Swiss-Prot record:
Disruption phenotype: Mice exhibit a strong increase in self-grooming behavior, defective social behavior, and some sensorimotor defects. Aged mice show decreases in age-related neuronal loss and increases in synaptic density in the substantia nigra and the hippocampus. They also exhibit a decrease in the connectivity between the retrosplenial cortices, subiculum, hippocampus and anterior cingulate, as a result of defective synaptic growth thus impairing their function. SUPFAM superfamilies: Immunoglobulin (SSF48726). Keywords: Cell membrane, Disulfide bond, Glycoprotein, Immunoglobulin domain, Lipid-binding, Membrane, Receptor, Secreted, Signal, Transmembrane, Transmembrane helix. Residues 1-18 form the signal peptide. Undergoes ectodomain shedding through proteolytic cleavage by ADAM10 and ADAM17 to produce a transmembrane segment, the TREM2 C-terminal fragment (TREM2-CTF), which is subsequently cleaved by gamma-secretase. Expressed in the brain, specifically in microglia (at protein level). Expressed in macrophages (at protein level). Expressed at higher levels in the CNS, heart and lung than in lymph nodes or in other non-lymphoid tissues such as kidney, liver and testis. In the CNS not all microglia express TREM2. Brain regions with an incomplete blood-brain barrier had the lowest percentages of TREM2 expressing microglia, whereas the lateral entorhinal and cingulate cortex had the highest percentages. This is Triggering receptor expressed on myeloid cells 2. Changing R47H: Decreases myeloid cell immune response. Reduces expression levels.
Length: 227
């Protein structure tokens, strides 16, 4: 790694500290995983999105967003090589950038959507490294994180591992609870309707049976007296 590259890396780290931005680095051709945490209660019922900021003051162009039905936010949504999934109970939205290319480098945002408004959860600066075989240089990338001058910056390095995880268990439990609750309510309604249809006929049958029994008993009691 040349001195110019190291200087640029230090400059980017200092800039990210000033902008409260997380720096993530990944190798070209491999995958990079981004996790944005948020307040689960504050952002309850809101969709999440991953967008790319165009320029320093430009708009943020949306890349991918979570499922339109909030209860299904744990399902993975894909747009090209970018995948997003949201664990709404844990308060973590995960974005996976597959097959990183040099053009994927840039400034991104994790957003919480509320109608037409978008609240920034986290800013992420993605760096794509061109030489995945140079382990010596890759190890040197951790120097800015250990430096006391840039203590507040967050720099991470990603390798090509199968980082796709299964569906978040908390969201699955929530979905199963809703399904079971809906089935219970449906069964209760059917039982109430069936019982309501039986009620009108029941007293009539019982009344006729009681009347016949009473008449039969009356004939038996008055029979000996009349003869």
């Amino acid at each position: 790694m040349g001195p110019l590259h190291q200087f640029l890396l230090l400059l980017i780290t200092a800039l990210s500290q000033a902008l409260n931005t997380t720096v993530l680095q990944g190798m070209a051709g491999q995958s990079l995983r981004v996790s944005c945490t948020y307040d689960a209660l504050k952002h309850w019922g809101r969709r999440k999105a991953w967008c790319r900021q165009l320029g320093e003051e430009g708009p943020c162009q949306r890349v991918v967003s979570t499922h339109g039905v909030w209860l299904l936010a744990f399902l993975k949504k894909r747009n090209g090589s970018t995948v997003i999934a949201d664990d709404t109970l844990a308060g973590t939205v995960t974005i996976t950038l597959k097959n990183l290319q040099a053009g994927d480098a840039g400034l991104y945002q994790c957003q919480s959507l509320r109608g037409r408004e978008a609240e920034v959860l986290q800013k992420v600066l993605v760096e794509v490294l061109e030489d995945p075989l140079d382990d010596q240089d890759a190890g040197d990338l951790w120097v800015p994180e250990e430096s006391s001058s840039f203590e507040g910056a967050q720099v991470e390095h990603s390798t090509s591992r199968n980082q796709e995880t299964s569906f978040p268990p908390t969201s699955i439990l929530l979905l199963l609870a809703c399904v079971l609750l809906s089935k219970f309510l449906a069964a209760s309604i059917l039982w109430a309707v069936a019982r309501g249809r039986q009620k009108p006929g029941t007293p009539v049958v019982r009344g006729l049976d009681c009347g016949q029994d009473a008449g039969h008993q009356l004939q038996i009691l008055t029979g000996p007296g009349g003869t």
